Amino acid sequence: TGQVVLAGEVKSNTYLDVQQIARDVVNAIGYTKGAYQFSGDSCGVISLIHEQSQDINQGVDRATKEEQGAGDQGMMFGYASKETENYMPLALDISHKILEELAAMRREGTEISYLRPDAKAQVTIEYSDDNVPQRIDTIVVSTQHDPFLEEDAAMLATIKKDIIEKLIPRVVRLFPPHVQALF
């Protein structure tokens, strides 16, 4: 659609050029080419930001940060895990690292030059009966890319080869030996 929609409630005495900030973020993510049909330089930016309700603001504004309220809150759930130093479940941590490295490779533009912004990854780990990771069963990576070969099967084969031979080794090096052994 070529649109960015900003929505929410804000209480501030500062002017922010939210349209330009949104465009800068879209460009920083990597949407910079007309071929993507979405670019920070040409997208529409719709701002639905309005002043925070007085009722919520009364619960938030305090003289010190120790007294600061949380305002309007969303609900979420999750859990911490001792599988990783950052307390994220191991499969999610590996997925995040895959996407971080894929984005770094896209920005570098040298090893895999056809990558576009927007990707997702999923990792499935096989566990023993006592919940000890045994091996990585499956890694799925889906990424937007430039069309670089005429035949789809050849393009898919190249992408798969690059993910396995170029991306995954970079990811493996980020982990301690006991996690590297799972790959």
Residue ranges and their predicted role:
Residues 1-12:
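Short, charge-patterned binding micro-sites
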Residues 12-26:
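Active-site-surrounding "flap" and adjacent substrate/cofactor-binding loops of secreted or lumenal enzymes
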